[in-house]
Structures are given as structure tokens and as C-alpha cells.
Amino acid sequence: MDQGTVDSPVTLVIKAPNQKYDDQTINCFLNWTVEKLKKHISNVYPSKPLSKDQRLVYSGRLLQDHLQLRDVLRKQDEYHMVHLVCASRSPPSSPTSDSHFSTTDSSSSTSDSAGPSLSSTPSQEAQANSDGLRHRGNPAATHGLNPAPTGVMQRPEGMPLPMQGGPAAGFPTHPMYMPMQMFWWQQMYARHYYVQYQAAIAASRASSVAPSPSLSAGPATQPVQPNEPAAPMGPNPAPEDRPANPNIQMNAQGGAMLNDDELNRDWLDWMYTVSRAAILLSIVYFYSSFGRFVMVIGAMLLVYLHQAGWFPFRAELQNPRAEEGAQDEADQNQDMQEMERMMDEGIEDDEGDSGEEGPDDPMNPGPHQPGFLSATWSFISTFFTSLIPEGPPQAAN
């Protein structure tokens, strides 16, 4: 090959595989080596890559540094496409995920190979350091010992100590945690069921007897212990004799419900109430005598005052209800003791409402049967009450 052909310039089109830069056109000579071409590329290419970081690929072939371009390039081509690949010196875009997988792989391989000998520990540490991974506080990477089970704290003496409250979420379940976890869930279920049972009892008897504060404060102050028998609870003192308010509305938590719609009425509500009363009185006035009109007004006023709580008509039933309240209190205490014993022994109540007594129990008489006068008065008062709008409910005593 003559000297003119060797010194003739050729055109190379440098293409980047990541498409970060546009294709660059470089003029060189056939007598150049690949190493000289790399140095020229490091000067003219936009990213200024180092020569040792460059990899040139031509027609699917990796070009070595000692090769000359005349031995590689095809003579019939006018433009020669060369792909430039540069080794990245910057850290990867997602080092957290890579380190996580690398640490997981190294931990699993260390746990498998730590049994035969401890002589491979320096080589593993050197390999981990070369990969850019740092194991801080990991006994498997520093001392070559088996890692402690997940969710177990290591004592200074080397004895495993299980954490309180069971294993954390997402961790693998260890066989030693199964009894502890089942016991912990059983205690939580028992406490929740105990609180719900007391709330239901307080809501059921709130209309007749005020709930005892000692029973409602029991679960919050002293949790149920599995190995200690529950102390017997003495009968609570009988509540004071006071009339119960039958118009109390109860909410789901067992307390009196505050109805904002009844307490905060606007002028439209009052206008509607007055118009209903005026229509009723006008009908009675025009279609009856004056005496009947006065009687209806008096009856309406009496019923309204009764609903407002000024004239209670159930004073004769206060003492029987107080006695029934004391009897119900003793029965509820007995039911509480029975339920606590069943929860302490870990027995679930599958028989339904086992604490309720039947109507044939001689110690628990049936409810008070109203007389003829009470039934007649209830019928008449209910009839007139349905015609008169109700007033706002009174607060609990």
C-alpha cells in the first residue's frame, strides 16, 4: 500500500449508545492506532472521556489499542460507524436498591458458608470493600458468626432476648414467637370483649340505674392477668332514690346523646311548631264549645309540662325500681366475675348469652306489671302526645 493511501484521511462517525450526545464526526488517518484515536476522542468529544475508560466497537468487534485503523476499517465505505462506550465513574442511580440486594445476597451466602471455617472472613471483607459495600454493626460480616434471628435482641452474654409485643410487621415468623404471639392476641381480644360487654351493660340499665364508675374504670386501670385469679368483687352500694328520665337518648358509647338539632332551633322550626298548634286549636275552637276548648288547652299544657319534666307521674314506681336496680347490680357483679374467670382460663364463650337468667328464676322476679289506670293514662297521654310536638330532651342527671 502506497504512502498516499495510508496518509489519506478517513471520516469516522462516533455514536453513543445512551443517546446522550449527538453523533460526532471525526477526521483521522489510516495509520493511526486505536490508542491514538482514543486520545483524539478525549480531546474533541463533548464529555471528554479518558482514554482508559473508552471502548470502541466497529462492526460488532471490540477494537484493541494496538491495532491500526487500516487493518480494521473497510476500504469501500465512505463513512465508518464506530460505537463509543465509556465506563461510568459515577455511582449508580439507585445505590439503595443495589446495596440492599447485594447485602441480602452477601448475608445469605455468609450464613450458608460460615459453618465450615472462619478463614474465609478476610477475603469476604476485602471483596465487600472492593464492591463499595460497608457492613456496620453486622456480626456476619465482621466476626463471621451466624446472624441473630430476626426480631431478637442480643444480650452481652450472648443469650437471645425476645422483644416485647411480638415480632414486627413484615418480619419472618420465628417458631419461638408463635406461643407468645397467640397469647398476646388472646389477651387483647379478652380486654376488648370485656370493655364492649361493660359498655353494653351500662347502656342497657342507664334508663333506670346510673352505671357504677368502678366497673367502667376497671379495664383501663388494671389489665387482666392470665395467671392470677380475679379478686371477688363485693356488691356496690345501692344508688340514691331519684326519678329516672325516660326521655334520655343513648349513644353507642353508653352516655347521653346530645341532639344539636333539638337544642339549636331556628325561626323556621319555631314557626312550624306554632302553626301546627294554631291549626289544632282553631279546629277545636270552631268545632266545639268554649268549655271543651279550655279543657283541650289545659290537657295540652299539662302534657307539655309533663314532657318537660315538671310533673312526673311515676313517683310511685321509684322504690320498686330502686330495689330492682340493687338486684340487677348484684346479678351484674356475678356475671362479671364469671366472665373474668372464663377469660383468665382462656375459654371462649361459644354458648351465646350464658349469663342471662330465665324468667323462672325465683331470685329475679319479672318486671312490674302496670295496672288498669296506668294503662289507661298511657293510652290517653300517647294519643295527645302524638298531636303535640315534642320539646327538647333534657340532659342526663
Curated annotation (Swiss-Prot):
A Gene Ontology biological process in which this protein takes part is: endoplasmic reticulum unfolded protein response
Among the entry's GO cellular component annotations, what is one?
Answer: membrane
User: Which membrane topology describes this protein?
Assistant: Single-pass membrane protein
Q: Name one Pfam family in it.
A: ubiquitin
What this protein is reported to do is described as: Could be involved in the unfolded protein response (UPR) pathway.
Q: What is this protein called?
A: Homocysteine-responsive endoplasmic reticulum-resident ubiquitin-like domain member 2 protein
Which ranges does the record mark as transmembrane? 293-313
What keywords does the record list, in alphabetical order?
Membrane, Transmembrane, Transmembrane helix, Unfolded protein response
Q: Which InterPro entries match?
A: HERPUD1/2, Ubiquitin-like_dom, Ubiquitin-like_domsf
What does the record give as the organism's lineage? Eukaryota, Metazoa, Chordata, Craniata, Vertebrata
- The main place the protein resides is membrane
Compartments reported by the entry: Membrane
Q: Which SUPFAM superfamilies match?
A: Ubiquitin-like
Q: Where is the composition biased (Low complexity)?
A: 88-123, 210-220
